[in-house]
UniProtKB/Swiss-Prot annotation:
It holds the Pfam family HTH_5. This is Uncharacterized HTH-type transcriptional regulator MJ0229. The keyword tRNA-binding does not apply. SUPFAM superfamilies: Winged helix' DNA-binding domain (SSF46785). The lineage of its organism: Archaea, Methanobacteriati, Methanobacteriota, Methanomada group, Methanococci. Gene3D superfamilies: Winged helix-like DNA-binding domain superfamily/Winged helix DNA-binding domain. The keyword Magnesium does not apply. Keywords: DNA-binding, Transcription, Transcription regulation.
Amino acid sequence: MKLIDVVKMGEALSNPIRVKILYILNKQPKNIYELAKELELSRPVVYAHLRKLEDADLVESDLVLEGSRAKRIYKAKEFKFYIDNEIIKKLFENE
């Protein structure tokens, strides 16, 4: 893992709303409308959080056709995040 990846993942996980989005998407993939409704937030706010999670490689999305309409479905990716002094040391020694 590279330093930038650790920073992106840490930043993505530092917000309680994003952690809740991961919790919801771990149970079941959802579109942005469903997430916004469940979180009681606007779609633009949820979208901004999803972009941060996608950038950290914690969430992925697929475009799915439903009738004549396309919907983007978001799902949580499998990940493990662990950091300790030894990992931090290796991050900077491998630059």
